[in-house]
C-alpha cells in the first residue's frame, strides 16, 4: 500500500475523456441473445466529443483504508435459489417437450394432457410400467397431444411399450407430418428410441401415437432436443454459467414440505408423478372427484401443469449434476414439514455416505460431498405443511440435526429463522448447538411510481433484518443465511429498476459481512422475477440477473466504508466499495438511477482501470417483454478515472499506487 493506510482519499467524478488525447477505451458489449453474440470496439479519443455536452454531476467520496472490514465477504452471499414452482425447473431448466409424459392421468380423463383421437383406449392397472396405470392402445386407436413447442433442430426420443405389432408416431409440424414406425415385440416393457428433425420453429406441433395392429401398452415417452445436457436445456445452462452464482439452494421453498426425495432418485422413467401438495393439496382433501378436478383445472390454469403436478424427472442427482456443471456449491433443503426423521437421515446418507442402503443406491460410488443442508422451510408459518409451534419445532430440529450429523458430522446446518418475530431468538436459544446458520426470508414491496422508494423498500428490508440478527448472533455465533429475498407480487419480468433494488439490498449484506454469510436470490429461472427468463426457445438474462452477475464477478474480498453526499428529492444513486488487499485494488459499485453522468476521479489511482456496466434506456427496461433492452458492457480505460452512466449499475476496478 506504500504507507497509505491512513490516507484519506477524496474523489470527484470526472468524465474519462476529459483527459489527455492518448486515452484509449476498449469495450466489449454483451446482451442476452439466443446466439450469444457479442460486439467489441476500440474507441479513439477526439478533440470534440459530443458526450462532453451531457449533464454531469460531481460527487466527492471519502474513505480511509484504516476502516477496512475485518470480516471478508463470503462469496456465498451471491447465491441463488431454484424451486419446483411454475416454470422454474420444467420448461425453464429441464428440456422435456412432452407434458405428462408418464400418463399420470388416464388419457382423455380428469386433467390429462392427452386426448383420445381415434378408437378405444384402455388402462393396464394390473402391470403398469409405473404409477397406477399404463395406456393400452387397441387396434386402430390413437392418442394425441397438441401444443408442442419444437425448435428448428434435431430431437431424440423414446417410448416404452409391450405387445406384438406396430406403433406409429406422427408429428404434425404446421402442415408437414413426420412419421416414425416402431416394431414392438416384447411381453414386457421395452425402451424403443426414435429421432426427428423439426423443419421449422413452432408452438403448434402435435404428436399422435397409434397402434396399427393388435393392442399395445405404452408408457414413459420422452422427447428432448439433441443438444440437451443430461436432460437440461443447454441455452438455460449457458445463461446460468453467465450468472456465475456460487451457491444453489434446492428444492424449496414451500414445495419441500410436501416433497419426498425418494421419488426423485433412481430411473427417472419409473419415478412417480405426484401432486404438488403444497400448492394443490392431497386427493383426500376433496369431497368428490368433480371438486378435485375443478380445483386441479383452476390450478393448472394459474400454475401450469408442472406447478400442479411434479413428474420427478429433475431430482437430487440432476441437481448435483447441474451444480457440478456450474461449479457451484449445492445446498439441499430437508423436508421437515411432512417429512420424517428417517427420511432426513437417509437423504444425507444418499448424498454423502460411503456405506449403507441409500449410499449404494447413488449412481456413483464417490460421495456427492454435500456440505450445506437446510432443515425445513419457513416452518414458522401456518401456511407451511407440517407447521407446529416453536417449542415443538425446536425439538424436531434438534432431532433432525443429530440424526443427520450421525451420518456425516461435517455437514453444516441451516435452521429455519424469522426475526420479524421471536422465532429466531427462540430457535437460537434452544438449538444453537445443532445449527450453524439461521435462515431469513423477505420479499420487499414494489413501488412503481417512485424509483427511490422502490430501491429503499428492498434496502430497508435487508437492513432491518440484518440489524435484528446482529443482536441475536452473539448468543451462539450463529451466522445469517438470507436464503430467499426478492420483490413480492412480481407480475412482470425483472427490469433494470428491480436489479437496482436487489443490488441495494446486497450492499447491506456486503456492509455486514460479519453477520451475513449466505444469501440466495429468489428465483433463478422464471417464477418470481427470475434472473433468467425463458420462453419455449430462448433464455434471457434479466435485470436482477445482470445486476447480480456484475456484482458477483467484481465486488469481493473486504468491505471499505465510503462517505458521499446523500441524494436530494427523488434522484437516487448509491455507492459501495470493496478492497482486494493482495492486489492493491479497490472496486467501486454504483447504482445510478438518474439521467446524469456521475463523475469520479482520484489522482492516487494508477492508470488502467476496468469497468463492468449494465445500462438500459429506461428504468423499466427488460429483456423478455419488448425484446433485448438491457446491455452489459465491459471496458478497459487507460486512465485513472471512470464514470457512472445514466440509468446504470456499474462496478469499476482501480489499482492503488
Please give the residue ranges for each predicted region.
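Active-site groove signature of glycoside hydrolases
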Residues: 211, 252, 357-388, 442-444, ...
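Acidic, Ser/Thr/Pro-rich beta/coil linker or hinge segments at domain junctions
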Residues: 607-644
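C-terminal motif of bacterial Sec signal peptides marking the signal peptidase cleavage site
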Residues: 18-19
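Aromatic/acidic polysaccharide-binding cleft in carbohydrate-active enzymes
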Residues: 84-85, 478-555, 559-575
Amino acid at each position: 500500500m506504500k504507507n497509505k493506510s491512513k490516507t484519506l482519499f477524496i474523489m470527484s467524478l470526472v468524465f474519462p475523456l476529459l483527459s489527455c488525447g492518448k486515452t484509449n477505451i476498449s469495450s466489449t458489449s454483451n446482451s442476452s441473445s439466443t446466439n450469444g453474440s457479442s460486439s467489441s470496439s476500440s474507441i479513439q479519443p477526439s478533440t470534440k466529443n459530443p458526450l462532453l455536452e451531457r449533464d454531469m454531476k460531481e460527487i466527492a467520496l471519502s474513505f480511509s483504508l484504516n476502516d477496512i472490514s475485518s470480516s471478508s465477504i463470503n462469496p456465498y452471499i451471491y447465491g441463488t435459489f431454484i424451486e419446483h414452482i411454475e416454470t422454474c425447473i420444467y420448461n425453464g431448466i429441464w428440456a422435456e417437450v412432452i407434458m405428462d409424459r408418464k400418463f399420470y392421468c388416464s388419457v382423455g380423463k380428469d386433467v390429462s394432457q392427452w386426448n383420445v383421437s381415434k378408437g378405444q383406449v384402455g388402462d393396464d392397472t394390473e402391470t403398469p410400467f409405473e404409477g397406477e396405470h399404463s395406456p393400452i392402445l387397441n387396434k386402430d386407436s390413437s392418442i394425441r397431444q397438441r401444443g408442442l413447442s419444437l425448435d428448428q433442430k434435431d430431437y431424440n426420443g423414446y417410448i416404452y411399450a409391450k405387445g406384438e405389432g406396430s406403433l406409429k408416431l406422427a408429428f404434425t409440424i404446421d402442415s408437414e407430418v413426420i412419421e416414425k414406425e416402431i416394431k414392438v415385440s416384447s411381453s414386457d416393457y421395452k425402451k424403443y428410441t426414435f429421432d426427428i428433425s423439426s423443419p421449422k420453429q413452432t408452438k403448434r406441433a402435435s404428436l399422435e401415437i397409434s397402434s396399427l395392429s393388435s393392442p399395445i401398452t405404452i408408457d414413459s415417452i420422452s422427447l428432448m432436443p439433441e443438444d440437451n445436457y443430461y436432460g437440461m436445456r443447454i441455452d438455460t445452462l449457458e445463461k446460468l454459467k453467465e450468472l456465475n452464482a456460487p451457491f444453489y439452494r434446492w428444492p424449496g421453498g414451500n414445495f419441500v414440505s410436501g416433497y419426498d426425495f425418494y421419488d426423485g432418485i433412481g430411473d427417472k422413467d419409473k419415478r412417480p408423478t405426484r401432486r404438488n401438495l403444497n400448492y394443490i393439496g392431497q386427493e383426500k382433501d376433496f369431497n368428490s372427484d368433480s371438486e378435485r378436478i375443478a380445483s386441479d383445472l383452476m390450478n393448472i390454469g394459474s400454475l401450469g401443469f408442472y406447478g400442479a403436478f411434479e413428474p420427478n424427472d429433475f431430482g437430487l442427482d440432476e441437481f448435483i449434476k447441474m451444480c457440478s456443471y456450474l461449479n457451484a456449491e449445492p445446498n439441499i433443503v430437508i423436508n421437515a414439514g411432512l417429512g420424517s426423521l428417517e427420511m432426513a437421515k437417509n437423504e444425507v446418507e444418499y448424498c454423502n455416505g460411503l456405506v449403507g442402503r441409500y449410499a449404494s443406491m447413488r449412481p456413483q460410488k464417490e460421495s456427492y460431498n454435500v456440505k450445506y443442508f437446510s432443515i425445513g422451510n419457513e416452518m414458522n408459518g401456518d401456511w407451511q405443511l407440517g407447521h407446529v409451534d416453536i417449542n415443538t419445532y425446536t425439538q424436531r430440529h434438534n432431532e433432525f440435526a443429530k440424526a443427520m450429523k450421525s451420518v456425516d458430522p461435517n455437514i453444516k446446518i441451516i435452521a429455519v429463522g424469522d426475526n420479524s418475530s421471536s422465532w429466531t431468538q427462540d430457535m437460537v436459544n434452544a438449538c444453537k448447538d445443532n445449527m450453524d446458520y439461521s435462515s431469513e426470508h423477505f420479499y420487499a414491496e414494489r413501488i412503481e411510481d417512485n424509483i427511490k422508494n422502490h430501491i429503499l423498500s428492498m434496502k430497508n428490508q435487508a437492513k432491518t433484518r440484518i440489524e435484528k440478527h446482529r443482536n441475536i448472533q452473539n448468543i451462539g455465533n450463529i451466522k445469517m443465511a438470507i436464503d430467499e429475498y426478492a420483490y413480492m407480487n412480481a407480475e412482470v419480468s425483472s427490469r433494470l429498476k428491480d436489479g437496482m433494488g436487489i443490488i441495494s439490498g446486497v450492499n447491506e449484506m456486503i456492509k455486514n459481512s460479519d453477520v451475513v454469510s449466505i444469501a440466495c436470490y429468489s428465483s433463478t429461472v422464471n417464477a418470481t422475477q427470475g434472473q433468467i427468463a425463458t420462453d419455449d426457445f430462448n433464455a434471457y438474462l434479466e435485470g436482477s440477473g445482470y445486476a447480480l452477475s456484475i456484482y458477483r464477478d467484481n465486488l469481493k474480498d473486504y468491505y471499505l466504508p465510503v462517505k458521499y453526499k446523500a441524494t436530494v428529492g427523488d434522484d437516487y444513486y448509491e455507492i459501495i466499495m470493496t478492497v482486494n488487499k493482495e492486489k492493491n485494488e479497490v472496486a467501486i459499485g454504483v447504482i445510478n438511477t438518474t439521467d446524469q453522468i456521475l463523475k469520479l476521479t482520484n489522482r492516487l489511482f494508477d492508470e488502467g482501470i476496468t469497468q463492468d456496466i449494465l445500462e438500459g434506456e429506461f428504468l423499466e427496461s427488460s429483456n423478455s417483454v419488448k425484446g433485448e433492452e438491457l446491455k452489459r458492457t465491459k471496458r478497459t480505460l487507460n486512465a485513472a478515472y471512470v464514470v457512472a452512466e445514466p440509468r446504470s449499475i456499474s462496478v469499476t476496478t482501480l489499482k492503488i499506487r
